[in-house]
Amino acid sequence: ASRGLGDVYKRQDKDIIKSTITSTDDGNGNYTNPVIFADVPDIDIIRVDDAFYMVSTTMHLSPGCPVMKSYDLVNWEIVNYVFDTLEDRDNLALRNGENNYGKGQWATTLRYNNGVYYAGFTSFSTGRTYIYHTDDIGNGKWDRFVYDECFHDMSLLFDDDGKVYLIYGGGQIWCIELEKDLSAVKPGTKRKLINDAGLVKGCLAEGSHVYKLNGYYYIFIITWPPHGRRTQLCYRSKALDGKWEMKVIIDDNMGFRNDGAAQGGIVDDKDGNWYCFVFQDHGAVGRTPVLSTMTWEDGWLVVGVDGKVPKTAKIPFAGHEKKSVVTSDEFINSQIVRSYHSFADTPEEAGESDYNGSNLGLEWQWNHNPDNRLWSLTERKGYLRLRTGDVCGTVANARNTLTQRTFGPECGA
């Protein structure tokens, strides 16, 4: 039988025991890939002191761009979101027959520099690029800079000389320089770094993640060859405008159909060990993250053993509490008011985006921007109250539809 949230949550003294259903911590010091058995695509990851932070794509959902935290790279929990409402437009709010499916927030780059966290992404729904920043990633408040142009699958680079770059593109990999405070793009700084990236494998590449390590610039990038599988490549050069070498980093389906594990970030620990976090398509569950160690060979970071991602491995830092990105299906009005903020520029109707005193758990997301006048956790304690708004023809067009991630290997409502 399929497993639903009701099967794994039990009430004791009116408290909810948090589930660990998306954790693959085996309880014996090992973990099993996928390391999070739930939809967490387009991941980027950083470490600050002993804590690891990760962001992911949530497209049309609201709030958007979840911030996840872990101390062992295996047990992750959602601690915040980057934004509540990206903007107030008809396509972002399921208004007037418009929608944002398959668009919205994509492939966020996450970086930490001089005490500030940065989360940046392009949205083809608005034709804009957003650079959010905060000094408290777990609680916000996030502020942002907005550029009125798109930089596909971009990656932030804080260089050793204090310059700041965006590396981006599909096939043609470009570079632009930003102002040092990231408030704007420096005019006249656009230049091409790599021509026809990934074409040697039969398909142009995208999904850049850029790093400066040991005197080299490394760009990790993904390609998807015809009749092949998603493959992780790495380009390196001693200068941004220099000659770029290429190496295949991962070409592995991990025994699951022909779905290759690729696209994501790398991170080190305090002892100098390196890890990669990429994702693999897992059907209806979505895009599930996989974790592998990395080792240096001839100036390249090599994944796992002979370029293969392990099915099971030791937890890098054992002994931490199990955590999950799916934690409850209860409608408890949280006492914690998260301080990610709405940037709705021109609300269609007063009150639609206003705070209504209800705080859903971080595992919940709305399908598109909600109408906050039409839902409540305060009118009846422990329950979600939904009120009808507009009449629509299909559930896909219904506002205030509440969602959670599916999880594997089985789940049900």
Please identify what each model-predicted range represents.
Residues 63-66, 127-131, 172-179, 228-235, ...:
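Structural motif
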Residues 22-35, 76-98, 130-149, 180-203, ...:
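Blade-edge beta-strand/turn elements of extracellular beta-propeller
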